[in-house]
């Protein structure tokens, strides 16, 4: 560990290192030096992100651009370089990075009230706005085709054909639900290909716990966990936030009668997001509801594909866990369809 701690340009000698936070992908530690300077030290999961150099280059480019937009150091993650001036260190075959600790900030797992949810929308909208003049072609796709729904359907059809465990017979209703929506769910990708919807810098994990809020004011400071920052549609980020933020139930709720999309929460998030992102194009605004529906559907499709394939991708904690997850997402999609006119009305009124 001492070799690792010596690898970074910390201010002072590190005196303590303890586990920090609750992320699933990377191991995170808080390091404090003898000058009482605090840093976040993180092991990068190179199984999930094999191109560590490309990933860290993305983060460096984005954070450097964001720094030009603010004088407040707490408003942007700040990478601590290694002693040989690199953005990450390799020690014993493991990849590590460090950030300055953001003082007087809090990170919430779930919103404690509607204001928290609204502020997360402002945070992600502001993130997109601040990066709207960034040359997005400079970024690599960390996970190629991450939200390419037609590509997800291609994998779905391949798995259906193989049906390794004979599970397809058990989920005919869910399969029918997907196939009926296949054409519509390719709309965003088609509009992206046709350049009707512009590529932007997208975050791709827009959960509340990826926003640091000011401890006193509860206003957003900065967006964190930039591993999946890459080119994409802002509708991906907006849609994913609605998918889990406006749902009335947990992602794996078995009792589908508890699952719906709250129009109130939809309205709160939409208002916050649009207010912070004034340069949304006319087309982007028009397709916001479809962003929410597509991201929710795509997530369900991935869960169903994994269930039929034998649960190889998502970690499961019970029999049929991925099927429960898929059904929850599809119930949300159906509820959005039932509330479609109201969703469009919310967007139009907010604009």
Predicted segments with their positions:
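Active-site activation/catalytic loop segments of kinase-like enzymes and analogous catalytic loops
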Residues: 235-278, 294-313
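Long, compositionally biased intrinsically disordered regions
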Residues: 336-339
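Juxta-kinase regulatory segment immediately upstream of eukaryotic protein kinase catalytic domains
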Residues: 1-18
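Catalytic activation segment of kinase domains across protein kinase-like and atypical kinase folds
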Residues: 195, 209-250
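Transmembrane helix-bundle signature of multi-pass membrane transporters/permeases
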Residues: 230, 291-295
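All-alpha amphipathic helical-bundle segments outside canonical DNA-binding/catalytic cores
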Residues: 280-292
């Amino acid at each position: 560990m001492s070799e690792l701690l010596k690898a970074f340009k910390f201010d002072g000698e590190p005196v303590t290192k303890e586990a920090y936070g609750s992320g699933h992908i990377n191991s995170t530690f808080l390091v404090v030096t003898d000058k009482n300077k605090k840093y976040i030290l993180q092991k990068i999961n190179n199984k999930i992100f094999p191109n560590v150099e490309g990933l860290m280059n993305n983060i460096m480019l984005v954070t450097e651009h964001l720094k030009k937009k603010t004088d407040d150091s707490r408003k942007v993650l700040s990478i601590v370089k290694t002693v040989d001036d690199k953005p990450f260190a390799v020690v014993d075959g493991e990849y590590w990075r460090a950030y300055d600790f953001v003082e007087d900030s809090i990170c919430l797992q779930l919103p404690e009230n509607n204001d928290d949810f609204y502020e997360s929308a402002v945070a992600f909208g502001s993130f997109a706005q601040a990066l709207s003049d960034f040359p997005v072609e400079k970024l690599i796709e960390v996970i190629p085709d991450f939200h390419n729904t037609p590509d997800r359907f291609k994998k779905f059809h391949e798995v259906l054909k193989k049906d390794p465990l004979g599970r397809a017979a058990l989920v005919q209703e869910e399969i029918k639900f997907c196939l009926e929506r296949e054409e519509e769910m390719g709309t965003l990708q088609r509009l992206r290909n046709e350049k009707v919807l512009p590529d932007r810098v997208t975050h791709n994990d827009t959960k509340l716990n990826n926003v640091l809020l000011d401890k006193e004011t509860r206003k957003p400071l900065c967006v964190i966990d930039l591993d999946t920052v890459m080119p994409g549609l802002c509708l991906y980020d907006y849609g994913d936030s609605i998918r889990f933020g406006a749902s009335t139930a947990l992602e794996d709720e078995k009792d589908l009668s508890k699952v719906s999309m709250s129009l109130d929460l939809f309205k709160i998030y939409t208002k916050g997001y649009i207010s912070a992102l004034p340069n949304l194009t006319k087309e982007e605004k028009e397709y916001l509801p479809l962003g929410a529906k597509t991201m929710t559907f795509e997530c369900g499709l991935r869960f169903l594909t994994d269930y039929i394939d034998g649960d190889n991708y998502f970690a499961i904690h019970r029999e049929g866990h991925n099927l429960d997850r898929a059904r929850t997402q599809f119930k949300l999609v159906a509820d959005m369809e039932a509330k479609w006119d109201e969703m469009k009305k919310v967007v139009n009124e907010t604009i």
